[in-house]
Amino acid sequence: MSKILIIEDEAAIRRVLVKILSEENTNYKVSEAEDGLQGIELIKKEDFDLILCDIKMPKMDGIEVLMASKKIKPEIPIVMISGHGDLDTAVNAMRLGAFDYISKPPDLNRLLN
């Protein structure tokens, strides 16, 4: 079973992602964090196969989470999620080591594949 961490400050979006990825037929174990600091604490404690991380968050933004995560566990792929379909942000995230970048609302078919 693959373990996924969702780091998203918007509760409604986080709930939808958790629900979709936790369904019986997906074979994922999903953990969640409501901000970057909480996400980093989970990354330190657990091993994840994938991290889905929002970019615009209070306390610690997604780019900071990406950089910190790459220092702690560089092997975990991180997909950045943002409501701001900004190409510069996407390019910057990829340059810093993000595996991929998707816009909100995420394309569920793309997310599951």
Predicted segments, located by residue:
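Conserved acidic carboxylate
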Residues: 8
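Receiver (REC) domain active-site loop signature in two-component systems and cognate sites
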Residues: 55-57
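Conserved phosphotransfer cores of two-component systems
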Residues: 24-25, 44-46, 68-75, 96
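Two-component/phosphorelay signaling modules centered on CheY-like receiver
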Residues: 11-31
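C-terminal output helix
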Residues: 86-88, 102-113
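Acidic catalytic/metal-coordinating carboxylates
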Residues: 35-38, 61-64
